[in-house]
Amino acid sequence: GTTILQAARQVGIDIPTLCFLKDINEIGDCRMCIVQVDGRRGFATSCIQKVEEGMNVRTHSKEVIEARKVILDLILSNHQRDCLTCTRNGNCELQNLAVKFNVTGVEYEGEKNKHKIDDLSPSIVRDFNKCILCRRCVSVCKKVQKIGAIDCINRGFESCISTIGDHSLNDVNCTFCGQCIEACPVGALKEKDSTQEAWEKLKDPETYVIVQTAPAVRVALGEEFGMPIGTNVTGKMVSALKRLGFDKVFDTNTGADFTIMEEGTESVSYTHLRAHETVLDL
């Protein structure tokens, strides 16, 4: 059946969510999507509550809005609020909701969870001092990537998202695909940034610096500068990289072409060598 959230979105009514990811994470944990249903006590979680015939739903009543503000206050009370230096500043779902509901301060102050930052993996940094326990990363790892490298561990105040045994991502079956980063609504997960190291190398006159770009980059960069989606900016990209100080710019396609030719040649040679062994009698 259709949920209240789905029905509302179909008719253009905006109900805020934090933990919801369609078909991936529909658990109602964050409670931001609460609504009032006439004739029922308390609030209903719209992302999991099914629509029923004759149901009268209030999505933006005074009581609902006040309850959502309290929920935001509680989430922020255990959140590391260093928004100015956070990589998600301006692109954070929690921050956007705080602005939308005019939550400028935190009424519920108290003890906070303190977690070590895990930056041992080659590409992902985990800072669960910013985690809101929405479990979107857990669901996308299990259901989309079919890996299940992370899960919710411990209970109550000690609950956190981590690996089994609370090991680093570097020590479990994580493939470093980055899907968890894409799913995270806040700054708890981010790509490892090597920008400063690159600048240091570019400033060193004794270092010969090269850059290798993936094929997708040449058609993704243009969007950041207001160009139509899919615009090929290879020339502009190479010129910009050279002006930054890179001595050579290589395209990953070159290596891919070599690999295709080499593996294709090996396959043809193998087929010819084993041709006399092929049996097709039926």
Question: Whereabouts are the PLM-identified features?
Answer:
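N-terminal cofactor/phosphate-binding cores enriched in small/glycine residues
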Residues: T2-E53
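Conserved small/polar residues in nucleotide/adenosyl-binding loops
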Residues: T271-T278
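Fe-S ferredoxin-like electron-transfer domains
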Residues: R31-F176, E182, L189-D204, Y208
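Short polybasic/polar patches that bind polyanions
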Residues: R9, V99, K242
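Flanking helices and flexible, charged tails adjoining ferredoxin-like Fe-S electron-transfer domains
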Residues: S162-S269
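Alpha-helix N-cap/helix-initiation motif
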Residues: C19-D23, K130, N170-N173, G230
